[in-house]
A protein has these predicted regions:
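N-terminal Rossmann-like NAD(P)+-binding subdomain of aldehyde/semialdehyde dehydrogenases
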Residues: 1-47
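Rossmann-like NAD(P) dinucleotide-binding subdomain of oxidoreductase/dehydrogenase enzymes
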Residues: 38-101
């Protein structure tokens, strides 16, 4: 248990900036998702170009063993924020705390 086992770092470092920065990744990408809008773009030829937001669907995220929490949130947060389902595959060497995310 505890912050150290969840991050793979000594508790003193995990309680510092590490977990807070990982949480900030979710906040950043949640705010970024408001850009997911449909638009009508006029073109010179009298036509219009239409954009449409659609999630990709299922996103596979493969995370390495080093710096696990931060690298996982960099992959998970944008995929979830833009409406996708995420399947996370942590490295076999990664601590078991990764399965809780």
């Amino acid at each position: 248990g505890g912050a150290g086992s969840c991050t793979g770092w000594p508790i003193s470092q995990a309680r510092g900036n590490y977990v807070a920065r990982a949480a900030a990744n979710f906040r950043f990408f949640a705010d970024h998702a408001r850009l997911a809008t449909a638009e009508v773009l006029p073109m010179d030829s009298g036509h219009h170009a239409y954009t449409r937001f659609e999630p990709a669907g299922v996103v596979a995220a493969i995370a390495p063993w080093n710096f696990p929490l931060m690298l996982e949130t960099w992959k998970i947060a944008p995929a979830l924020a833009w409406g996708n389902t995420v399947v996370l595959k942590p490295a076999e060497d990664t601590i078991l705390g990764r399965l809780a995310i």
